[in-house]
């Protein structure tokens, strides 16, 4: 399923013959619906994080850049590692072979204190040109 909230999943589970295996959701630093992630994980539903780099808008956040520098990685690498440490399947989008290679180089660990900071990072209010989706673009 995609973009199912807890109520949606509960309704589906009442009638479905086969439980969903994956819930693909928008998940990144500044949009971390932990209650939904924990619900899915508790119920054996994998969470797939699409747009872990926040449609590119996270690249404009100096606090995130500073944390990436602390770990000696790029902002996209920090973002991807963050979603992996949450126990999600991460789906970064790129057509650039260099970015693909870099996106796979996430063999570091974000410490617990920094994970909490990232979980509670201020919400990005606009995804710019990528904000065409009414719900996530703040248009509803």
Please provide the spans of the model-predicted regions:
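Beta/alpha (TIM)-barrel catalytic core signal, keyed to glycine-rich beta->alpha loops juxtaposed to Asp/Glu
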Residues: 1-140
